[in-house]
Amino acid sequence: MAQEIEKEFLVKGDFKSEAFKATRITQGYLSSVPERTVRVRVKGDKGFITIKGIGNASGAARFEWEKEIPVEEVQQLLELAEPGVIDKTRYLVKNTDGKHTWEVDEFYGDNDGLTVAEVELADESEPFDKPEWLGEEVTGDPKYFNSMLMKNPYKNWK
């Protein structure tokens, strides 16, 4: 099982002109308890099941296990999922430092209007350039977890 270390930010400006790839994602949760989440996802034309552990104190690091599964199985598992589905497009944007790639998620449906960006790091103290379109850091803030957006979507925050 690998440890995932990410920093997450709100997006405040235009990033799409810098994106080199865009993929539609639909996902649901079989379990969304804080100690572990079990997610099923269709990403483009592939299916995945992912288990994530609880985050560390900063919220930047947690264990993650992911396996590709047939899209048909994801669709069947979505029938068993908790209420609510996350629908988004993930854009990939190369960072100006040449070492990192930003994953920028633009949400739809009940989370329309929310766009967040995350960068994966080798360790929490690793330096990285912050593009001009980045806003406030929200690393570790549970309300921005996809599993929480399913329960308390962005449209309800206003």
Question: Which role does the model predict for each range below?
Answer:
Residues 1-158:
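Phosphate-end processing signature that detects enzymes handling 5′-triphosphorylated RNA
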